[in-house]
Amino acid sequence: MKNKTIKVDYLARVEGEGALYLKIKNDEVADVQLQIFEPPRFFEAFLRGRPYYEAPDITARICGICPVAYQMSAVHAMENAFGAVIPNEIRELRRLLYCGEWIESHTLHLYMLHAPDFLGYDDVVHMAKDHPEVVKKALRLKKIGNDIMNLVGGREIHPINVKVGGFYKVPTRNDLMKMYDDICWARDAAIETAKFAASLEFPEFFQDYECVSVVHPDEYPFNEGRIMSNKGIDISPEQYDFHFREEHVEHSHALHSRIRERDNYLVGPIARYNLNYEKLTPLCKEIASEIGLGKEVYNPFKSIVVRGIETLYSCEEALRIIDNYRMPDSPSVEIEPSEATGYACTEAPRGMIYHRYRVNSEGLIEDAKIVPPTSQNQKTIESDLRNFLPTVINLSEKEMVWKCEQAVRNYDPCISCATHFLTLHIERE
């Protein structure tokens, strides 16, 4: 294999439509292009002219797996614009809603999408034939995450109970306690999940990432905090555009993100873990140590293990919130719209999301900017592939493509119903 061009005309399980192009010349990697068409650009356009209070419901439709991330980013940005002060009781309910999303999303990715790659199965259906109890446990764990979203958010997919200022309706303590035993089971299942993920075989592949994440002084980040990196960034969401920029590339409709004056960066579970390890619970740290996960991770293939730890954290955090729950005096606070610009960053399961809205005096959105984690990671995925390909270049074409699938899947780009996300066509020089 001296010269070879590999074209992948369609990538499923990414945020929109995409393709992969790999060029090998004289047994060396000549070019890597991950081409992604990104739906959120359309959402920015048709948000213009809409009332501010429609933003949470509209942006939730960007993703069916992590709608809460887009809703939370929208409500926080609007509340930032209007100077709204949110009571702690509502803030805690929002964290609980986010716990549900992390549990269901991480579980879906870990067991249904990524584990089959490591275990040599085409998909989870084939995996279930040999590991039925593992898959049954995964389905129950995911359902518990969905149940939390349903209870707090009004429904599992595209929740309808979230509003700028709080919620339309809040659960009673009895409502939450009905889920308590299930979440206790989920906590134990999450421990087993982290151990299962750590038992998989990982290639020796490490990258010097600039990790970027929301960082909160007191808690593992969901909704609030500063934007920080392991290489010196420490800014508020209002300063995002001064430090990060998006750029057009010829081979993709999606925008590449980079740090100004530097280059690509990493968002997602590994970035969060590396920057927020000390905010994890004692049990999370204990399990991480037991399975050989240090305080920092730079092997992207081990993102599946970090997702296991974050699933455990989400279960523990959900139990803590329920234990201390007190119904707010009102489901929401009053919002007084004004001419303003609002900014927010929250942590989707896949990584940090940035929202910026400019609103006029009538409360209508004049401009919107949404930067999802997949677009932020696109340049880093290409970098991973460029550095990883030389380690698998002598494998058969089938094995090489399979390894590339794993490398892309580390980032959980998005979910679709496709069985495989690479349809391979080879053009020989």
Regions found by a protein language model. Name each.
Residues 350, 355-357, 367:
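A translation/RNA-centric and nucleic-acid-associated enzymatic feature enriched
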Residues 363:
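Active-site catalytic microenvironments in core metabolic enzymes, especially phosphate/sugar-handling
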